[in-house]
Amino acid sequence: MTALPRYAVFGNPVAHSKSPQIHQQFTLQEGVDIEYGRICADIDGFAQAVSTFFETGGCGANVTVPFKQEAFALADEHSDRALAAGAVNTLILLKNGKLRGDNTDGIGLVNDITQVKNIAIEGKTILLLGAGGAVRGVIPVLKEHRPARIVIANRTHAKAEELARLFGIEAVPMADLNGGFDIIINGTSGGLSGQLPAVNPEIFRSCRLAYDMVYGDAAQTFLNFAQSNGAAEVSDGLGMLVGQAAASYHIWRGFTPDIRPVIEYMKAL
């Protein structure tokens, strides 16, 4: 009996990851069987865990917090997206034995906004809250969709200025934000502890979409705040999660899943 193609998500912690359920739905669309598991790597043992996985028949891997920068360093080759982001969330073992790293976070975000929510990015004014790896990973793909303006704001302004210089966008101190944004994307981790970004509630007044890159309960504090202060539509990052997974699946298998039914399936769990 031929062994099933093996894939996994690496993280620490990783027990909460919904990636196995998502990829199971993709296999139903493609009509195949694969093996997809969770691997909790030791904080100082990521490289060894990945090496063991691929040496024992692994075909591809997703990488989540806190290993995306390590995955970048581990990859022998990188996509343009990964190079721009400085982080890798997708690894594939090539036929020549080398590991190629990609970053599909930006694709996941943009596809959720433009294809699922039918909100155009082109010509819009976008505010990014936060300046960590999650935000850095999505800026290159947002820029490809030609917004009129991207503004970044972070609690530590120097970090926002650093990303602004790197990507040719604007940095504005959080306290100085005063509205005029079509799309506001929260990439801070404050929601995990129920904290809000220190922004003027007025910035949501003309906002078409307020989006939190995390999903589930952790997004609700920000989304409730945005909605109660005038945001026309709010969304957590479940669609981004499914979208980035679909892009990874395509890299591994050459099959492009339809993310809409999978998003609805995951919402119902």
Curated annotation (Swiss-Prot):
InterPro entries attached to this UniProt entry: Aminoacid_DH-like_N_sf, NAD(P)-bd_dom_sf, SDH_C, Shikimate_DH, Shikimate_DH-bd_N, Shikimate_DH_fam, Shikm_DH/Glu-tRNA_Rdtase
Q: In which pathway does it act?
A: Metabolic intermediate biosynthesis; chorismate biosynthesis; chorismate from D-erythrose 4-phosphate and phosphoenolpyruvate: step 4/7
Enzymatic reactions: shikimate + NADP(+) = 3-dehydroshikimate + NADPH + H(+)
One GO cellular component this record assigns the protein to is: cytosol
According to its UniProt record, this protein's enzyme class is: oxidoreductase
- The keyword Cell membrane appears for this protein: no
EC number(s) stated in the UniProt entry for this protein: 1.1.1.25
Residues that, per the record, bind NADP(+): 80, 130-134, 154-159, 213, 237
Residues that coordinate or bind shikimate: 17-19, 64, 89, 105, 215
Q: How does it assemble?
A: Homodimer.
Q: What does this protein do?
A: Involved in the biosynthesis of the chorismate, which leads to the biosynthesis of aromatic amino acids. Catalyzes the reversible NADPH linked reduction of 3-dehydroshikimate (DHSA) to yield shikimate (SA).
This chain's protein is named Shikimate dehydrogenase (NADP(+))
| Native species | Neisseria polysaccharea
The gene for this chain is aroE
